[in-house]
């Protein structure tokens, strides 16, 4: 650190208020400062690496040179506060508040039902708000683009986009291809005509309620900041922190002086590279130099032979500049510009593009850079400057590959980049393939250019650059040199492919894995470029240069990024229902406005408690090992550290029900908690945790995969089995028998709010109070009491809301709560325990990976006579929920099909991975995708459509399941029939077949899936529930129940129930929190039964109260509610009541293999249509139609939101979400960079959901639980992908080829799709002997 005297004041504005920081610390981010110093907790912490958008805020700056104010979104977790000098920051609190005025953006997000858990909502609001500040009348495409950097795990995005589209000047034209009237009107008529002719509705909200947007009412930019920006006497600023110094030069000479003095100091502009490297790679820099807003770095000149762009331009500004240039210049001059523009649309999200600069992007020379390969191919030059002078260097292969002779010298900076215009016979392209279309780093990207001799196809110059193939961007310079002078023809292409494979060869165990896929992508992307040039030549001279075959043109078309639209259809409320009765209405989430304003408080939003400490974890780095020693000396010596907590500090049990709180003597997985560090700040705790030294001695065996567990007979629980008929005998009397296996990998919950606990010890009676987000407060209470060795009545758990859960907060908060409580007990001080995203993913695990093996006997007609199934799940190292999950897998394994001879066996494997746990669908989504795989295989062998085989084998009449529970499948048949009809399945299937005949390199797939989903659990006492209702003397009602609000709208529905039962408006009813103090012994909120059981308890309590009030009401029937309550009090009538529901009487006898395991079933059907790019492995979901048996929906908006969100989450499970483990059991996917949940661009372009009405007498108001059912319907997407891939394989192999059983797996990632679409390029790829190398990652299913 330089020896400097004092620190300058940092001045910026937040929400119109001036902030002056006397001693700003360069290591403090804007997110931390907003939340901890300014107590603006609406801006959320979710990933810490700029990948999720939950911390989005708007930054505004005034440019003295252009005299303009620029508003742009940023991720506050990456913004150092020292970079904000002279800037204005707007957070969600500055946009609007329920205490003052809710902004139209916030209002519409809430009223369009765009919030569920609400954790991502402030970020969504800020992204749309910033867009409107720049474009008050945005296009739908701009709305979609603005949301591309924001992740949501709950809603499925559709309602969020819809809320943004309400601001568009020209509403999107209806694209549901129906003749005549608006699709909504026709859909309404058609829906009403089905079966019951009930009146169906399509409006989930009333847009006439929206307040108008008035841009003139937005806050003005602070005049003081304009004066600061225009100050002619600016000087260098110095900000001195605890460990680092921030230097902000005022002029270019000053910058060069600092660069010469501190040549190793990073230049900070957007901090999108340096920030994550500091946090995740442990880098440390004593000095930062930040040349923001220097005019010399912001030049833009498009005159002459090219474009000069200052290095200080953000990528968003670069995009704007290039769009302007492309619109003004002839197309042949803008080949490079258009290639860059194309990549800029999907590079990261809008927030990162607004922060990252061109200079930083060029100078870092990252292998995953999307722009550098294109810049290199376009012969870009870099203008460098230092104290010694100026020079220009080519941005070429030598520069990108890190050659010392071709890079920046000490003291130099990138001043600008010169992008030359292209010529008529020059062609430049940028190509990429990532795990998902937007906001994902490329697996492989490329920049390619060719300059042909004028008027010919002779190569004068060829440039090919690849990213993602090595540690740097690589140039195929040798191959390109050999091809100069050759003709641009098929022979040249073949030589180029062979040359590139020889020149750029990845080792088989290369970092990142996917070696064969990456090799294939090199050739596929080259082929796309080859075709593009061929077509361009044909357009220049059709006589001289023949066009490419028509069926090849699809290779040139990239999947468009459209704006999703669709319909939501549900049964209208009975017109005779009292107007104030809210049941059946699409009521807004009771906390929706608070979500949108950031005023809904989550655990980490709670104010700091006096003497509070922060907890950081030390986790095992070995999968199975003895702990030899734990050295805490260096950690304890660090400033701010109060204690290191180990197993020795646990007062009670350290191992409860097989779950270990702190590792003791040995570790059984990578990620197991060994110890924790408590310190005065999280930064100090985290630093100290990194200093704890743990010595291990490995233990064999180390079991990571299911296959390894089977080899060692390593299981967590006994086998479960159900069987009907005579399976072995039936196999002898069928036309054909096929066998296969399907691997289904796991899934990360990726709830937006990571596991968070605030544990507060009380001074007397050994009490402990915990605030946390959980689905099971009783379980937390049990584990904490056990760990502290106190009765449960000393432990109070408070749960107001969780920022998403999906099963991940059923058991894991109990273990983590015990860990935090032990720390609070040892230190005697409150403990705040917030897991970072990477630690959360590592420690808490997720959905069980599954291996399914099937044997199916069937007739030539497609009728299945016998099925024998074996399922194995990877349970991890401790029991957790694995036994219950495998029981669900077995019980649900038939899905919607009647197989007369059916056997299913299942077992949970014990491995050295973190214990997998409950996840939405609870085993059903993994197991039944295996069922659909064998349905598809049977169809292939019978030359039938899979849908024909599904319908043939579906339950058709009142029946009993394989475990002897009776049910009526009539709603299943109705959902199937309606979906078949209203999705126009057969017409679209014929259209897809026509498309596939005319398109070689893109294939269209269509699939329709039925579903019979179970609700609840086979254990009766898990269905009991209780509620507590107080009526106060002013007539207001306080409602409490045992269910947890996770975003699923449970509290909203409970208020609707109470409103109906008490006959009062919901505005009279308040629901605060779930607590073990008010409702004891509550069961978990899971299994889609939250409304079923808690609704019954609330109903019971309200009916008890109304029975007490009846004498008062009878005497004054026309009186008001308040009068009745006052009179009841005067008559000493109790105005408080508990409600209780004993539960559904379910049971399952595993010895007899029979039982009434579930209270009822939910039925549904979904149809999905996808396009697949056979060359890259990308896919595009074109349309999804969902028909869900909702019986009577208490709240159609909530239920449709649950269905859409579950469908998109299921789609993620089956496509983009891929967990990767090292062979030694280390999770490699630990953040937004490595794990890709769907974004707004992945959801269907057309998204139609219909709630089908039926009856369900066992549940409250004849409703059904719909929280999980939609998850499996996402499998319609993977089935459609299988259909498209099968079409590609059939075309390659020939129409007369023998039917095959496609070796399917889940997820169907770009890698699987591409390698399954075998062609001449996959045939060229060398295959390495697996026994000769250690792979970078492995499948654990």
UniProtKB/Swiss-Prot annotation:
Belongs to the xanthine dehydrogenase family. NCBIfam families: mam_aldehyde_ox. One of its GO terms (molecular function) is NAD binding. AOX genes evolved from a xanthine oxidoreductase ancestral precursor via a series of gene duplication and suppression/deletion events. Different animal species contain a different complement of AOX genes encoding an equivalent number of AOX isoenzymes. In mammals, the two extremes are represented by certain rodents such as mice and rats, which are endowed with 4 AOX genes, and by humans, whose genome is characterized by a single active gene. Binds 2 [2Fe-2S] clusters per subunit. Binds 1 FAD per subunit. One of its GO terms (biological process) is xenobiotic metabolic process. This is Aldehyde oxidase 4. The gene is AOX4. The keyword Iron-sulfur applies. Its cofactor is [2Fe-2S] cluster; FAD; Mo-molybdopterin. The lineage of its organism: Eukaryota, Metazoa, Chordata, Craniata, Vertebrata. GO terms for cellular component: cytosol. It catalyses: an aldehyde + O2 + H2O = a carboxylate + H2O2 + H(+); retinal + O2 + H2O = retinoate + H2O2 + H(+). Aldehyde oxidase able to catalyze the oxidation of retinaldehyde into retinoate. Acts as a negative modulator of the epidermal trophism. May be able to oxidize a wide variety of aldehydes into their corresponding carboxylates and to hydroxylate azaheterocycles. The active site is at 1268 (proton acceptor).
